[in-house]
């Protein structure tokens, strides 16, 4: 049985958040990036969070958001953790009185160890697929052999994961956590409860 943590990202509906919690997800993610098909506004996020059971971590995903925009969201949405998924510098990620993680889009030749050291204040590093011009949510996996055995920070593995490949991904990378969005959807932004259950079952059995 696996102790790998899990996050269901791109939640836009209360029923999907509850399905994730019921299936045993440790965290759910809200995308505050208007260009994403999974984007939510503060009203949606607040309504969903208000219905959550205890012990489900709420994560806000941001892509090159201004400090003003981010602070306005944090004033009204009770987020536990911030996920920076753009080109933010370490300084951009600090100062919000919330723990945070930094997403890196992986491609051959990247020095992931140096990147981890650069984002020293991050609680973890999320590794996602590199697609030019797309900050995330590509639905494509990357070459897991590019991930060093030890990076010095908890690794959250993302990018093209589903019930069919997450067991293999966990065996190969040995991440602290896995992050899924498109792999548990029936349409962009609309989750499928059966796919969430299958994904969580595969994580636990890995």
UniProtKB/Swiss-Prot annotation:
<keyword id="KW-0822">Tryptophan biosynthesis</keyword>
<dbReference type="InterPro" id="IPR044643">
    <property type="entry name" value="TrpF_fam"/>
</dbReference>
<dbReference type="InterPro" id="IPR013785">
    <property type="entry name" value="Aldolase_TIM"/>
</dbReference>
<keyword id="KW-0057">Aromatic amino acid biosynthesis</keyword>
<dbReference type="GO" id="GO:0000162">
    <property type="term" value="P:L-tryptophan biosynthetic process"/>
</dbReference>
<dbReference type="InterPro" id="IPR001240">
    <property type="entry name" value="PRAI_dom"/>
</dbReference>
<dbReference type="GO" id="GO:0004640">
    <property type="term" value="F:phosphoribosylanthranilate isomerase activity"/>
</dbReference>
<dbReference type="Pfam" id="PF00697">
    <property type="entry name" value="PRAI"/>
</dbReference>
<dbReference type="InterPro" id="IPR011060">
    <property type="entry name" value="RibuloseP-bd_barrel"/>
</dbReference>
<keyword id="KW-0028">Amino-acid biosynthesis</keyword>
<protein>
    <recommendedName>
        <fullName>N-(5'-phosphoribosyl)anthranilate isomerase</fullName>
        <ecNumber>5.3.1.24</ecNumber>
    </recommendedName>
</protein>
<comment type="similarity">
    <text>Belongs to the TrpF family.</text>
</comment>
<keyword id="KW-0413">Isomerase</keyword>
<comment type="pathway">
    <text>Amino-acid biosynthesis; L-tryptophan biosynthesis; L-tryptophan from chorismate: step 3/5.</text>
</comment>
């Amino acid at each position: 049985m696996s102790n790998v943590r899990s996050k269901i990202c791109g939640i836009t509906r209360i029923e999907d958040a509850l399905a994730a919690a019921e299936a045993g997800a440790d965290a759910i993610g809200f995308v505050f990036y208007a260009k994403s098909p999974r984007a939510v506004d503060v009203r949606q996020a607040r309504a969903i969070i208000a219905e959550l059971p205890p012990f489900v971590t709420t994560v806000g995903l941001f892509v090159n958001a201004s400090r003003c925009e981010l602070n306005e969201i944090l004033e009204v949405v009770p987020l536990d953790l911030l996920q920076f998924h753009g080109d933010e510098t370490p300084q951009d990620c600090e100062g919000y009185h919330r723990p945070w993680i930094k997403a890196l889009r992986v491609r051959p030749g990247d020095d992931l160890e140096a990147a981890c050291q650069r984002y020293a204040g991050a609680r973890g590093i999320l590794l996602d697929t590199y697609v030019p011009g797309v900050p995330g949510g590509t639905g494509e996996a990357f070459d897991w052999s590019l991930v060093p055995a030890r990076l010095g920070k908890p690794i959250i593995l993302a990018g093209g994961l589903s019930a069919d490949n997450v067991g293999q991904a966990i065996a190969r990378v040995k991440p602290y956590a896995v992050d899924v969005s498109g792999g548990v959807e029936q349409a962009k932004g609309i989750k499928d409860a059966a796919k969430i259950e299958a994904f969580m079952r595969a994580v636990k059995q890995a």
